[in-house]
Amino acid sequence: EDLEKRANYEILNDWEGEIERSGMFRRYILRFRYGLYDTINIHIDCSMEKTLLDPDINELANDYYVAKIKVMKREEILAEKVRAIYTRHKGRDLYDLYILAVILKSKISVGLIHEKFKSYKIEERYSFASFERKVEELRRYWADLKSLVGNFESLDFDKIKEEVLDVFRNA
């Protein structure tokens, strides 16, 4: 049976031709319509850079096959997000860190954060005091999440900031 008819979806873009490239980074965006009205975008971000930790192997399964995918360990993703907070101004980095550190309780390794900074040649050294300042600087970029998160109105910057800082304070 034809999968598109059975699942009632339609791919809306040439996702293989619309790859975003930047250095050692690739983003694949798949846009499809599911049902009559729902349009869904799926972003698949791929880093071609070597990870500091060996990747985990996750399985992605459907009715037809199982794919084994190498994924960065959560602990390293968390270190990447700390690095991102030091090098750019995006509210989503704090949100992602909140999910990783507070909700998922991913391990925080200060040593790994230092290694990550070194691998990106970031001269500023991680410390809780500098991290606290960097997190506060994201306040003015918090509204950028509106278009990314469906429940944005329920996300209180101060509450999320404090919960993230509490976890890092005790790391």
Model-derived regions, located:
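Structured mid-to-C-terminal alpha-helical surface segments
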Residues: E1-A171
